[in-house]
C-alpha cells in the first residue's frame, strides 16, 4: 500500500516540497568513537538508522584542539540535543577507541537527562592478529 505524503507548493516560485512526519524515537544507541585526533558521536535508533551525529571538527574545533575533552563534550552535547528533540528518553552507549574525549563525552551524555541502560566498551583488540607496522623513527 502506498503511503501518501502531503505536498506543499508556493505560487511564487512553483516549487513543490514534500513534508515528512518526524518520527518519535523513545530508545536509541549512542556511539562514541574517540580517536587520538577527533571524537565522533553518532546517535542511532535501535535498528541502526542514524538520527543525528556530531564531531569535534563539526562543532568548530580545528587542529590540535579537536582532541581535547572539551571538544568531545561539545560534540556529544550537539548530537544529543537533536535526539532529545525527537523524543529520545533511553539509550545504550557504545564507546570505541583510545582517545582523550571518551570520558568527557560520556559525562556530557549523563548530564543530558537521557536514561542510560547500558555502557559498553567495544574497542577492537587483536588476539595476536596482523603484524603491526614498524616503529616510527624520528
Curated annotation (Swiss-Prot):
Q: Where in the cell is it found?
A: Plastid
- Major location, coarse class? plastid
Q: Which Pfam families does this one have?
A: Ribosomal_S11
Question: What SUPFAM superfamilies does the entry give?
Answer: Translational machinery components
This protein's UniProt keywords: Plastid, Ribonucleoprotein, Ribosomal protein, RNA-binding, rRNA-binding
Q: Which GO terms describe its biological process?
A: translation
InterPro entries recorded for this chain?
Answer: Ribosomal_uS11 (IPR001971), Ribosomal_uS11_bac-type (IPR019981), Ribosomal_uS11_CS (IPR018102), Ribosomal_uS11_sf (IPR036967)
A GO MF label: structural constituent of ribosome
- Could you name the domain of life of the organism this protein comes from? Eukaryota
Which cystines does this chain contain? none
Q: Per the record, what is one GO cellular component? A: ribonucleoprotein complex
Quaternary organization: Part of the 30S ribosomal subunit.
Q: Record's family? A: Belongs to the universal ribosomal protein uS11 family.
Concerning HAMAP family, the annotation shows: Ribosomal_uS11
**What is the protein name given in its UniProt record?**
Small ribosomal subunit protein uS11c
Q: Which organism is it from?
A: Cuscuta obtusiflora (Peruvian dodder)
The record's gene field reads rps11
